[in-house]
C-alpha cells in the first residue's frame, strides 16, 4: 500500500510540475504584455535550478530588451533568495529523498557529484571556496548548489548565506558583462 501511495505522489508531481516547468521555460510572453508580468516571469525563471541567473539575465536583456541594470538587480535578488529556502526546507528535502525513491536516487547522485566537485575548494578555503564555487557561472555551480554544499559540509548558515550571496553577485556580474559583450564568449 505504501508503494502505491509513493508511486501516486511521484506520478501526480510529475504530471503537474513537469509540464508547468517546461511551459515556463519555453513560454513566449508577447512584447505588449505588461511590464510587471515580464518581471514576474523573469523572477520565476530564476528559480529553476538548471536556469538560475545564467539563463535569466540573457533572457531579460536579449529577448525582452529589459534594462541591463534593472535585470541584473531583479535576477540577482531572486537568485539570492534561493539560499534561505534551501536552508528552510533542508529537512523536507531529506525526507522526500528518503521517501520517494526516484527523487532519492537522483538527489543522492547529485549530492555525491557536488561533494566531489566542491570538497577541494571548501576544505581548503572554507567561506572563500564556497563563494568562488558559486561565482563561476557554469551549470551546477549556482545558488542551489552553494546552499546544498553549505548543508552537506555543515557550514554556519549565516556565513554560508553571505558566501553564496556574494558568489551570486559575482556570477551575475560575469553573466551581465558577457551579455553586454564586454566579456567575449568563445563557444566551440
PLM regions and their residue ranges:
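Hydrophobic alpha-helical transmembrane segments of integral membrane proteins
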Residues: 15-16, 45-48, 54, 81, ...
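Interfacial loop-to-transmembrane junctions
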Residues: 3, 149-170
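N-terminal secretory/membrane targeting signals
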Residues: 1-24
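Membrane-interfacial helix-loop-helix
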Residues: 20-42, 66-134, 155-158, 165, ...
Amino acid at each position: 500500500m505504501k508503494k502505491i501511495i509513493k508511486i501516486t505522489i511521484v506520478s501526480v508531481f510529475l504530471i503537474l510540475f513537469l509540464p508547468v516547468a517546461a511551459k515556463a521555460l519555453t513560454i513566449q510572453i508577447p512584447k505588449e504584455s505588461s511590464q510587471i508580468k515580464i518581471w514576474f516571469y523573469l523572477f520565476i525563471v530564476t528559480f529553476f535550478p538548471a536556469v538560475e541567473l545564467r539563463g535569466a539575465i540573457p533572457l531579460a536583456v536579449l529577448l525582452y530588451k529589459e534594462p541591463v541594470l534593472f535585470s541584473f538587480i531583479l535576477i540577482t535578488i531572486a537568485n539570492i533568495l534561493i539560499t534561505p529556502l534551501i536552508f528552510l526546507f533542508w529537512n523536507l528535502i531529506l525526507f522526500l529523498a528518503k521517501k520517494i525513491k526516484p527523487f532519492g536516487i537522483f538527489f543522492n547522485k547529485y549530492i555525491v557529484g557536488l561533494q566531489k566537485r566542491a570538497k577541494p575548494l571548501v576544505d581548503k578555503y572554507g567561506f572563500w571556496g564556497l563563494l568562488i564555487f558559486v561565482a563561476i557561472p557554469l551549470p551546477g555551480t549556482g545558488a542551489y548548489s552553494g546552499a546544498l554544499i553549505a548543508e552537506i559540509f555543515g557550514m554556519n548558515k549565516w556565513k554560508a548565506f553571505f558566501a553564496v550571496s556574494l558568489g551570486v553577485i559575482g556570477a551575475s556580474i560575469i553573466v551581465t558583462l558577457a551579455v553586454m559583450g564586454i566579456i567575449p564568449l568563445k563557444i566551440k
